Structure formats: structure tokens, C-alpha cells
């Protein structure tokens, strides 16, 4: 078996444009990622910020549905310097946008409780996470975001007007 130190120092992406952290975030569980905890240093911290060929960083990969332990993985990635407000290159979605698009209430709640989270970032389609939740008529995520102080307004979503206010 190749030691984690050697793997982490090999920052060359594979044919999919993914480094080892991209792979572990998508395919591994938290114990696989924890094996790298003592290996990540200033010399290879950039691995947590690299984009794959699909324009996604590790924070976007773990925010997708079907990924094991997304909150725990995000905690580790943030310790390693990953940006919780980082935008993917294709649509400009943040992890919070992805949670709203996929209606992942648990992840949205966790993200909204993180220091430094920006709930008002617009993606490249000029949508905030709140607007995405509004489009999907996901009142639970809308309430989560409102409870944490997101700016709300009047949105026309799917031919219906939703009037919201800041509480």
C-alpha cells in the first residue's frame, strides 16, 4: 500500500482532472479522509482548493446527494483551508446552493450554522440559495435560511408569487 504522504504529495490530477481528495470525498467515507489529516500541510493544502474538470472543488463534491458523511467531510476540508462559500466554475453554486437544489435539509441547517457562511451569494444564474429553495417550494429550507437571517424579498417562482419577509 502506498503511504498517504506519497499520495498527497502527488498532486497530478488523473484523467478526470481529480486529485486524491476529490476521489476520497466522492467515493470514500470519513475514515478514508481522516487518514490524510496528519498529511495535509502547507505544501499540499492546495489539493482541497483544486477544481476537477467538471469545475468542482471538494466542498461541492461532498455537498451532492449520496455522499457519505458530508458534514464531517466538510469540517475536515475547512480545517485544510477549503472555502465553505466557494463557487463551482460552471454554475457558480456554493455548497449551500447545492443543498437547496437537492433539498438536503440536514446539510443546509449545518451549513447555515457555520461561521463565515454567506447565505446571500448569487450563482451565475443570479440565484441565491433562498431563491433556489423558493423555486422548489421548499418551505423548510426557506425557513432555515430565514431563521439564520438571510435577506428575503418577493420572488416569482414557477408562476406563483411567494411573499416572504425577514423575521
From Swiss-Prot:
Gene3D superfamilies: Ankyrin repeat-containing domain. Pfam families: Ank_2. It comes from the Viruses. GO terms for biological process: cellular response to tumor necrosis factor; symbiont-mediated suppression of host NF-kappaB cascade. Keywords: ANK repeat, Host-virus interaction, Inhibition of host NF-kappa-B by virus, Repeat. ANK repeats lie at residues 54-86, 91-121, 125-154. One of its GO terms (molecular function) is NF-kappaB binding. Belongs to the polydnaviridae I-Kappa-B-like protein family. Suppresses the host immune response through NF-kappa-B inactivation. Possesses ankyrin repeat domains required for NF-kappa-B binding but lacks the regulatory regions required for dissociation from NF-kappa-B and degradation. Therefore, prevents host NF-kappa-B release and subsequent activation. This is I-Kappa-B like protein F2. It comes from Microplitis demolitor bracovirus (isolate Webb). The lineage of its organism: Viruses, Viruses incertae sedis, Polydnaviriformidae, Bracoviriform, Microplitis demolitor bracovirus.
Amino acid at each position: 500500500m502506498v503511504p498517504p504522504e506519497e499520495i498527497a504529495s502527488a498532486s497530478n490530477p488523473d484523467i478526470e482532472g481529480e486529485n486524491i481528495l476529490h476521489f476520497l470525498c466522492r467515493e470514500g467515507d470519513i475514515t478514508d479522509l481522516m487518514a490524510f489529516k496528519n498529511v495535509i500541510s502547507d505544501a499540499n493544502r492546495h489539493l482541497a482548493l483544486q477544481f476537477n474538470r467538471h469545475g468542482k472543488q471538494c466542498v461541492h463534491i461532498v455537498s451532492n446527494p449520496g455522499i457519505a458523511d458530508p458534514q464531517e467531510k466538510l469540517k475536515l476540508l475547512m480545517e485544510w483551508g477549503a472555502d465553505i462559500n466557494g463557487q463551482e466554475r460552471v454554475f457558480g453554486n456554493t455548497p449551500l446552493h447545492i443543498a437547496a437544489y437537492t433539498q438536503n435539509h440536514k446539510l443546509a441547517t449545518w451549513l447555515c450554522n457555520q461561521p463565515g457562511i454567506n447565505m446571500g451569494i448569487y450563482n451565475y444564474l443570479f440565484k441565491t440559495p433562498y431563491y433556489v429553495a423558493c423555486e422548489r417550494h421548499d418551505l423548510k429550507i426557506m425557513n432555515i435560511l430565514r431563521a439564520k437571517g438571510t435577506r428575503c424579498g418577493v420572488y416569482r417562482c414557477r408562476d406563483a408569487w411567494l411573499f416572504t419577509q425577514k423575521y
